[in-house]
């Protein structure tokens, strides 16, 4: 268990998540046809900029895996989430970077996007990952490729992904089906 985390009752976790979902729903800005025509973009910036909204989201995400000993945030908004959750749990935080942003050696994984492909990376040395219990965080779960690729990186490094969590899940894109054996929590799920 993390140094500062306390195990909460399921009822308390559900209440915390419901409050965070209300904050996310209230504060998220939606943009049609951004970044390309036909895409409806969820801008979570107002959630992160609002003290109560951000606190609520961080506390909800931290409750997903109080026994994690490392929090990993996916580039780029996952960095904000990861730092807040790691501070809450008393763990370290690791940034899962887009390809080409870390010096070698790296562990890398390519994945497909709606409009092409991309890669994610974590350090290949300098951070001992073997045996670590990782909570993986991202802002939005859409098609699921990004989160699945990030999870694969940690498995390849010998770590265990004990849980993954996102602020917003776009269920109609089916991203949940691409995830591994770890529990996946979404603060707000949109059909």
From Swiss-Prot:
In short, the EC number is 2.4.2.7
The record, for InterPro entries, names: Ade_phspho_trans, PRibTrfase_dom, PRTase-like, UPRTase/APRTase
Q: Which UniProt keywords apply?
A: Cytoplasm, Glycosyltransferase, Purine salvage, Transferase
Q: Could you give a single Gene Ontology term from the biological process aspect?
A: adenine salvage
Assembly notes: Homodimer.
As for what it does, the entry says:
Catalyzes a salvage reaction resulting in the formation of AMP, that is energically less costly than de novo synthesis.
- Give the family, as the similarity comment puts it: Belongs to the purine/pyrimidine phosphoribosyltransferase family.
Write the protein's name: Adenine phosphoribosyltransferase
Species in which this protein is naturally found? Nocardia farcinica (strain IFM 10152)
